Amino acid sequence: MREILHIQGGQCGNQIGSKFWEVICDEHGVDPTGRYKGTAAESDLQLERINVYFNEASGGRYVPRAVLMDLEPGTMDSIRSGPYGQIFRPDNLVFGQSGAGNNWAKGHYTEGAELIDAVLDVVRKEAENCDCLQGFQVCHSLGGGTGSGMGTLLISKVREEYPDRMMLTFSVFPSPKVSDTVVEPYNATLSVHQLVENADECMVLDNEALYDICFRTLKLTTPSFGDLNHLISATMSGVTCCLRFPGQLNSDLRKLAVNLIPLPRLHFFMVGFAPLTSRGSQQYISLTVPELTQQMWDAKNMMCAADPRHGRYLTASAMFRGKMSTKEVDEQMINVQNKNSSYFVEWIPNNVKSSVCDIPPTGLKMASTFVGNSTSIQEMFRRVSEQFTAMFRRKAFLHWYTGEGMDEMEFTEAESNMNDPVAEYQQYQDATADDEEEYDDEAADDHQYES
């Protein structure tokens, strides 16, 4: 079976991650003690591929294939005392006592480096338990110290050890207006530098965009992190539903990557989810494939603060869940591309992939998850990069990092590495089909002369 190993790090990662496990347990009929509680009728579907995310332990308990890490015990304690706290294998909670203090260098070089071997041992143990490991999914934020510093350290170590497995990350970027710490731009830039090199697919999330969705679409006046994490977990569950349930058009992490990544460094995706409705208005909304399609391509639905209308889609993927006709899904997708052709690059024809999974999320008739590779994601990088430069020019707060043994050179390097994807996205946003052809002709001429 194609297993996925889930790793969550830092406060943000652990909070998103534990919410995700609540959703997954719910979808597979697993109760907080790890026992299966579904009916006989559901059991075929729920249990057929439950081992993608769960290990079956003695006595028929299902244990998540999850590794939880943090540099301070606080978040772990609250997960343990939470509703699904007893479901995780106790050995898989690896934590330090010191904390990273929002300092990337502590997470990556000093505190995190001391704890990393313990985490890797657990990861190896879990990986050996797998039949045919498909890949890893990592939940972390890029603004803090542990999720960003230690998270990227773990990603690079896992990359070294399992070079041929997919590495999918759910990365929460610092948002433009909501800032928790002053040094977010530093931490994020140093992390992006790592993600460009070592991750295969990055789902970019952002608190501000999530707040906007809660506020505007869900009509929540005071959204809590719980509400935001609920949105994220719905999306996470949607991205992997094809692996966990039978469907007419299934995809896995690798198929997703092959269809979404035209060039290796351009692997930062925007995600969206539909239907998003406020709690009171569900009964007034009919769920049809056109409705879902319209909502999921809507710029307001994107979970990161970049506007897809400011760029063009290189590729996109739509995952539908529920009983629906594949033909209708395909027609809708073609329809979207024809109507909005200016928002798609013309040098990748048919660049929207769709997949259909027969089992909808709990409580919905149908739903869809959107993953898009849009050049407008460079807005995110640009914004962080500007904030980084403003502080780095004055060498503000730098002593916290150099004190942990970092070098100023690393900052300069990270800054230019952050600007690489920006330039690359811009280049392909401006490229037209004709540029490419001229280029090919020139290349062909060169070859004739060389031979």
From Swiss-Prot:
Residues the entry annotates as binding GTP: Q11, E72, S141, G145, T146, G147, N207, N229
Tagged with keyword Magnesium: yes
Keywords from the UniProt entry: Cytoplasm, Cytoskeleton, GTP-binding, Magnesium, Metal-binding, Microtubule, Nucleotide-binding
Acidic residues composition-biased segments: 432-444
Cofactor: Mg(2+)
Example GO molecular function: structural constituent of cytoskeleton
Disulfide bond residue pairs: none
Primary location class: cytoplasm
InterPro entries given in the database record: Beta-tubulin_BS, Beta_tubulin, Tub_FtsZ_C, Tubulin, Tubulin/FtsZ-like_C, Tubulin/FtsZ_2-layer-sand-dom, Tubulin/FtsZ_GTPase_sf, Tubulin_C
GO biological process: microtubule cytoskeleton organization; mitotic cell cycle
Subcellular location(s) of the protein: Cytoplasm, Cytoskeleton
Pfam families the UniProt entry points to: Tubulin (PF00091), Tubulin_C (PF03953)
Residues holding Mg(2+): E72
Entry's family note: Belongs to the tubulin family.
Function as written in the Swiss-Prot or TrEMBL entry: Tubulin is the major constituent of microtubules, a cylinder consisting of laterally associated linear protofilaments composed of alpha- and beta-tubulin heterodimers. Microtubules grow by the addition of GTP-tubulin dimers to the microtubule end, where a stabilizing cap forms. Below the cap, tubulin dimers are in GDP-bound state, owing to GTPase activity of alpha-tubulin.
Name of the protein in question: Tubulin beta-1 chain
Species name: Solanum tuberosum (Potato)
